[in-house]
A protein has these predicted regions:
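N-terminal nicking endonuclease/strand-transfer module with a His-rich metal-binding environment
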Residues: 1-179
Length: 179
């Protein structure tokens, strides 16, 4: 059984292009792309416009330029996971934290060729794009314990082993020694 992980970051400008495979990538096997699945509620641009409108209506001012109302989670999955698994996970994350999944993608076509064996080494993962705001367009403020709980929920919903909790000051050397 694989270990679970989800890494959350502000969404990037090229997120939809990457997730929807609108650009050719050298680490993607096009012959496996038919195994990818997607779930799209709306475009990132439309959701941002809606958030900005709600924020302006509730606060009487524009949203700060540095605000990150849309965030993306990249999570490890196994070959058998489907978009329905991600929808179920998204529903649970919304119940627990109020974050709403606006897009989800399974990527089963990425990986690399082993230099030693010539064998394809897949990198099964998923991208989930979240509206990280409340009904007034204000960013949700999830703390470290919330993010730790999110890791546990990912493991539970996907039937994976919960990854080890790491401290803020974990170093790559520590990880390398554990191998």
């Amino acid at each position: 059984m694989s270990k679970s992980s989800i890494h959350i970051r502000p969404v990037s400008a090229g997120s939809e292009t990457h997730n929807q495979r609108l650009k050719e990538l050298n680490y993607v096997r096009a012959d496996l792309s038919q195994d990818n699945e997607s779930y799209i509620v709306d475009s990132i641009a439309n959701v941002i416009k809606d958030i900005e409108t709600r924020y302006r209506n509730s606060r009487g001012q524009k949203m700060q330029a540095k605000a990150t109302p849309i965030r993306e989670g990249v999570l490890l999955i196994e070959k058998h996971h489907t978009i329905d698994d991600l929808k179920r996970l998204g529903d649970r994350l919304e119940k627990e934290f109020g974050i709403k999944t606006i897009q989800a993608y399974t990527h089963k076509d990425e990986g690399h060729w082993s230099k030693e064996t010539g064998e394809w080494k897949p990198n099964y993962h998923a991208h989930m794009v979240f509206n990280w705001t409340d009904e007034k367009g204000k960013n949700l403020n999830l703390k470290r314990p919330d993010m730790e709980k999110m890791q546990t929920i990912v493991a539970e919903e996907l039937g994976l082993e919960r990854g080890k909790k790491s401290g803020k000051d974990q170093t790559r050397a520590t990880t390398a020694m554990e191998r």
